[in-house]
């Protein structure tokens, strides 16, 4: 699904943190954000994910305008360089953690944990701890 930013601007107290103009990123295209510290790379990602609201402009995924949608309705996730896995917990426990916090029933937690582990191809690693995984495996667990 194509990501399209149209005249996206974010101001903080009159200072422009982001002023993208308009551009799009095609589905499946690997894209990097490069620039010096403080140039707005993280702010742009926060805008796309819905963690910040733009001052002006629009954000589209495919034909869908997601500018006003809350983060949980956008279907977008971020995976940071520090994957924030709990080192004392197994892969299964890390994947299940959000569901446990929402007090979902045990059967649903087990089902969703297996489903997500299979989706990101870590089902053989469920009993391991993050320190026993490669960086790529840790990233896939964080995505799950």
What do the predicted segments below correspond to?
Residues 1-144:
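ABC family nucleotide-binding domain
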């Amino acid at each position: 699904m194509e990501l399209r930013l149209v005249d996206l601007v974010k101001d903080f107290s009159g200072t422009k943190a982001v002023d993208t103009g308009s551009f799009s990123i095609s589905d499946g295209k690997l894209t990097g954000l490069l620039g010096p510290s403080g140039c707005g790379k993280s702010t742009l990602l926060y805008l796309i994910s819905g963690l910040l609201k733009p001052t002006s402009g629009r954000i589209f995924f495919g034909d869908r305008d997601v500018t006003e949608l809350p983060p949980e309705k956008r279907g977008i996730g971020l995976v940071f360089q520090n994957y924030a896995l709990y080192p004392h917990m197994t892969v299964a426990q890390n994947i299940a953690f959000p569901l446990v916090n929402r007090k979902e029933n045990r059967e649903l937690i087990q089902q969703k944990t297996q489903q997500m582990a299979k989706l990101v191809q870590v089902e053989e690693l469920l009993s391991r701890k993050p320190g026993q995984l490669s960086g790529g495996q840790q990233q896939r667990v964080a995505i799950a």
